[in-house]
Amino acid sequence: KNEKEYEYLEMCSSNRVAGIILCSGTVGVNEFQGLNVPLITIERFLENGTGAVECDNIQGGRLAAEHLIAQGCRHLIHISGVHETAMPADERAAGFCEVCVQKNVQYQVVGTHAYEYNHLEYHEVLEQLLLQHPDTDGIFASSDLIAAQLLQVCAKLGRKVPEQLKIVGFDDVNIASLTTPPITTIHQPIKEMAATAVELLVRAGEGQVVPSRTTLPVSLVVRGTTERKTEGEDDKAL
């Protein structure tokens, strides 16, 4: 974990916090055991945590695959999480693969490495991926950040999006609507997840039993990386 996370742990200990909401994927739950307070995690399930709030990552993977296939894609790639680390992206990959198998569509899942994940830098691996698989016509990226960098690589290589390659991201963060073309993505209900985490933490602090896992639905937001839009047409949420 990084220095900031150490500082936050020290702050929790010195201030005798009443509860913790954990979003980090790197801090171990054992770090909090000595605090003896309720622990709610977001997008991370811990066997000995108080409760976890997650989005429906499996359904997100399904929606992405179904949309790419419906748009005519037949050679799909999913850019997933870090090979050696359990991540929410693993469930997204599972949903994606499930649909590809059902539809008998050619696909592969490509994992990333800790370096790319930690440095938020995917350009080199994405360029190599496109050069090695020139017939790929649809890519589901496990985050909008990866999808945005993929757009930059496509521009460099002269691959037209969405005419030659269609892209779906995940999260629906601000960058997804700011790229050219804007990114079709799976909307993650972050505000609702945060509000649910706070509610569960308060209930747990009052001594109530809270569910070990709470899953919120995701939705597909169609933008320019998979569909041509007429001028002035709003984003369509399905």
Predicted feature locations:
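Glycosyltransferases and closely related glycan-assembly transferases
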Residues: 31-37, 97, 102, 150-159
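Alpha-helical recognition/docking segments in bacterial nutrient-uptake
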Residues: 1-66, 130-131, 135, 238
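Glycine-rich phosphate/diphosphate-binding loops that line cofactor/substrate pockets in enzymes
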Residues: 65-76
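Short beta-strand and adjacent tight-turn residues that come in two discontinuous sequence segments
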Residues: 22, 78-79
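Short acidic capping loops at alpha-helix termini that bridge into adjacent secondary structure
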Residues: 75, 107-110, 160-166
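Flexible loop/turn connectors
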Residues: 127-236
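Short acidic/polar active-site loop segments enriched in Thr and Asp
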Residues: 18, 73-75, 137
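Hinge/beta->alpha junction and helix N-cap segments in small-molecule ligand-binding domains
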Residues: 1-4, 53-63, 79-125, 140-148, ...
